[in-house]
Amino acid sequence: IKNLGFGIGGLALGSLIDPLSLGSIGEEGVALQLQSGPLPLPHFAPKAKRVIYLFQSGGPSQLDLFDYKPFLNKYRGMDLPDSIRKGQRLTGMTSGQDKFPVTGSLFNFKQYGESRAWVSDLMPNLSKVVDELCFVKSMHTEAINHDPAITFFQTGSQLPGRPSIGSWMSYGLGSLNDNLPSFIVLLSTGNGKPQPQPLYSRLWGNGFLSSLHQGVQFRSGKDPVLYLQNPEGVSRAERRKMLDHLASLNEAQEKTFGDPEINSRISNYEMAYRM
């Protein structure tokens, strides 16, 4: 985040400025801006205003961090019995193996806090705040490869196409800000990693929800979102005029086909203009 510089800060500052005062816009533009304001709030009172969700793709196994499995060490080296495997198919990396030995963690675990949560010695600082954390260990998937497992974790299904958790948060919480996306995605590859984890846009996709809830990826540098700046030689007023004409064409299409996604696209274009 520290490398994002003025980019995100500039967008945040812009959200505090009256959008109608930023350059010359036509009457149609004003109407569209008022139409495509913040996302409507839900019909119930949300218990949270915002969600920061961190997903460490390719991070250490939970079996080495906080999911203590003493029997894995007790039976270390023993071939995995069929009663456990139950015909589970093999991965490409293990299909050539003759045996499938049980492997325990190489790290020591201790219990911490009043909750007596198990944490390994890999996380000495996290162990100091375990009573402020909730460990969910009941999730289960039959996926045996990273890609379908990660897709399941983000969308609740191994098959691509369903809304991501961030899109559901956007849908459930709404938005009080009409100048920034309600769902923002930041990617970080860390240091010293020659090949980052393959992360696909479907992991923050909106699925069958409106594209208003699609995650918007912010990049580092002066242009956190691509194509927001006016092209060279094109003024803000000229861009406003082009957007107005484009909106007229899209509105005609919406009247013909009745596809609500067309209105969502108009709203997204207007947000990009305000950003």
Feature annotation, model-predicted:
Residues 1-275:
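Ligand-binding pockets and gating/stacking loops
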